[in-house]
């Protein structure tokens, strides 16, 4: 089926996103120039330019030039806060050849700008970016010139940029993890954890945090390629190869679309279809089949088999554009149905119920661009060897890098994907909703080809917060009710509509826990639960043996890190639980007291700091064992356990 006009809703989404999917180019006639060298940065208002790292952040650039101390050491967090209040500029020069400028099209592609950025090319304003979570594709052929070209990006302070919204809002949102008296984080589509959390450093940075490229094309380009699984049996996989193709030329274009498929080095199988591309965006659907498909399996069940798919656009016997994906053939359902005990909540993979064993994942570093490919590989090796099969990407961080989802595919790890909203109500004015729509469009399209992606979740704990965290007492009734109306617009209307439009085969829940139970016994039989009776409620570890949910999507207990880690941020003279340095790395206001309270129940409190740290780690392990074993013992009533949390973003 060929749709030469395209659906209005899809076109609207593309215009909102201004987005291009991150993809691998190979064996085609396009040319990709990576702009990751020659960058300089400067504090706005000064003329001191220094070499910059791209992708990168202004904090890391300042650290590299010894203009900031190591933010993770001692109490240095206090010494870096001035950066968030300043504007910063980045610039580079690159060369365009006469041959490149003869191409039919040139696109400047930013995969990530953090966050408020004005982009200039040769002095012309191309873009005013305002969302960290989307990529931007800008046609630039008319702005380019033969020889040297100048690219300049002006980053506005995310603090000063959002102060006018705060001042006109009339109240301070209850975003208490934002470590500032004015809670500005909710106004920006920017990683919430960067403003601080009850385990995290505050480092509100700016920068070009994902790759920048210029792409030159002739005739046509592929802006999206979705391999949609229609039906799967042991005998046959029926697929639809859905492409969004841009005919760059001002006239109809005769072309051939070729779909290539191979498996583990086997001979490539191809199907082709002749098409006429109208000028502009064309939507093309080409059916294909895989006989005797080898299914993608989760970790512990078998091999996570992946097929290689590529789509090529051929004009006059020349491949002018190509996109490729690795595709896992499988079925995944989130079974959420009424039963004799309440409401089930479990993953069914390839028709078989699966007990979820895993954890909640937060960003691996306070400075995201410091996470190397090697760190991603180590993370997933550890996840696999720990016999996990599910990771929840928590909603206070970021939509992860492509490498994360590729490794999840390769290691058989299902991904529970939150949208990036956590622990506070958010605005719902038209401008904010438009940004969120662009964000949802971009990331659903970017991630939907991954076999590992199991589900979408609207937010972390926001409905629970609205119901149980005292907002009804702390805000006037009209504001409190507006928070609920805003919740409905975001999480019951906008986001599920985008999932249905762009990724209809995946399950969406509006929040986790979706019943908003806050550990109440009457709701343990319904859906997923966050049980913080242990820790905040000071209930015993033994209570986890009996406080049983259908699916435990969060529970946990804090400890200090190992002494090896403590030695990276504290000197021996700081080795006291309540020292200034240790308190700076304890972000929970009740953390030290609760660790001591629980320790007193089962152990003699050690006097020596190193012993206290060690016993605290044992204590944490003891508590987690109670929960993990209880959840596994009680299946199929309980069908999953995800502890909080898998990792840290700094030494804390």
Where do the model's predicted regions map?
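Substrate-binding clefts and catalytic carboxylate motifs of secreted carbohydrate-active enzymes
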Residues: 31-34, 40-48, 53, 193, ...
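Flexible loop/turn segments at secondary-structure boundaries
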Residues: 115-117, 160-161, 204, 335, ...
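Loop/turn elements at helix/coil->beta-strand transitions in domains of secreted/extracellular proteins
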Residues: 148, 354, 386-391, 409-414, ...
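Hydrophobic faces of well-ordered beta-strands that scaffold small-molecule active sites
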Residues: 357-359, 391-393, 415-417, 551-553, ...
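Aromatic-lined substrate-binding rim segments of carbohydrate-active enzymes
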Residues: 390-434, 527-529, 535-538
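Active-site neighborhood of glycoside hydrolase catalytic domains
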Residues: 410, 427-519
């Amino acid at each position: 089926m060929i749709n030469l006009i395209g659906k209005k809703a899809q076109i609207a989404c593309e215009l909102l996103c201004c987005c291009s999917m991150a993809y691998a180019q190979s064996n085609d006639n396009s040319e990709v120039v990576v702009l990751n060298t020659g960058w300089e940065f400067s504090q706005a208002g000064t003329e001191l330019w220094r070499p910059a790292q791209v992708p990168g952040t202004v904090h890391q650039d300042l650290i590299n030039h010894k203009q900031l101390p190591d933010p993770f050491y001692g109490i240095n967090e206090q010494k870096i806060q001035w950066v968030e209040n300043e504007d910063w500029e980045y610039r580079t020069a690159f060369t365009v050849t006469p041959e490149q400028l003869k191409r039919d099209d040139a696109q400047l592609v930013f995969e990530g700008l953090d966050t408020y950025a004005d982009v200039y090319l040769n002095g012309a304003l191309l873009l005013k970016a305002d969302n960290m979570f989307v990529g931007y594709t800008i046609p630039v052929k008319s702005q380019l010139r033969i020889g040297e070209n100048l690219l300049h990006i002006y980053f506005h302070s995310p603090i000063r940029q959002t102060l006018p919204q705060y001042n006109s809002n009339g109240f301070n949102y209850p975003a208490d993890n934002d470590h500032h008296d004015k809670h500005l984080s909710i106004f920006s589509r920017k990683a919430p954890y960067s403003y601080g959390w009850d385990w995290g450093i505050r480092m509100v940075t700016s920068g070009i945090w994902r790759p920048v490229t210029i792409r030159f094309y002739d005739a046509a380009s592929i802006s999206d390629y979705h391999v949609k699984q229609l039906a799967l049996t042991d005998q046959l996989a029926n697929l639809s190869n859905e492409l969004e193709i841009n005919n760059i030329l001002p006239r109809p274009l005769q072309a051939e679309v070729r779909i290539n498929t191979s498996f583990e080095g086997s001979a490539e199988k191809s199907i082709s279809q002749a098409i006429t591309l109208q000028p502009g965006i064309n939507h093309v659907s080409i059916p294909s089949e895989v006989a005797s498909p080898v299914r993608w399996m989760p970790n512990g069940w078998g091999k996570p088999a992946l097929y290689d798919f590529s789509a090529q656009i051929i004009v006059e016997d020349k491949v002018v554009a190509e996109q490729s994906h690795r595709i896992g053939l499988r079925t995944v359902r989130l079974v959420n149905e009424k039963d004799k005990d309440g409401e089930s909540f479990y993953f069914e993979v390839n028709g078989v119920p699966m007990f979820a064993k895993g954890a909640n994942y937060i960003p691996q570093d306070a400075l995201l661009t410091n996470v190397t490919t090697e760190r991603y590989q180590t993370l997933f090796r550890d996840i696999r060897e720990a016999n996990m099969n599910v990771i929840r990407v928590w909603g206070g961080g970021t939509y992860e890098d492509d490498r994360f989802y590729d490794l999840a595919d390769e290691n058989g790890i299902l991904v529970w994907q939150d949208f990036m909203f956590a622990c506070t109500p958010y605005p719902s004015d038209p401008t904010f909703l438009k940004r969120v729509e662009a964000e949802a469009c971009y990331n659903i399209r970017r991630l939907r080809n991954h076999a590992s992606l199991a589900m979408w979740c609207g937010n972390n704990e926001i409905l629970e917060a609205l119901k149980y965290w005292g907002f009804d007492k702390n805000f006037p009734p009209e504001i409190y009710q507006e928070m609920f109306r805003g919740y409905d617009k975001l999480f019951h209307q906008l986001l599920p509509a985008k999932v249905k439009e762009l990724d209809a085969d995946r399950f969406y829940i509006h929040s986790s826990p979706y019943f908003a139970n806050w550990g109440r016994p009457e709701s343990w039989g319904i859906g997923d639960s966050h049980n913080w009776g242990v820790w905040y409620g000071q209930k015993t570890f033994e209570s986890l043996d009996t406080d049983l949910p259908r699916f435990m999507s969060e529970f946990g207990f804090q400890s200090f890190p190992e002494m090896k880690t403590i030695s990276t941020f504290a000197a021996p003279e700081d080795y006291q639980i309540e020292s200034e340095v240790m308190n700076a790395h304890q972000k929970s206001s009740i953390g030290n007291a609760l660790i001591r309270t629980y320790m007193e129940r089962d152990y003699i409190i050690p006097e020596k700091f190193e012993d206290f740290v060690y016993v605290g780690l044992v204590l944490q392990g003891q508590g987690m064992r109670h929960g993990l074993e209880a959840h596994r013992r009680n299946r199929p009533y309980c069908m999953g356990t995800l502890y909080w949390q898998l990792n840290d973003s700094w030494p804390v």
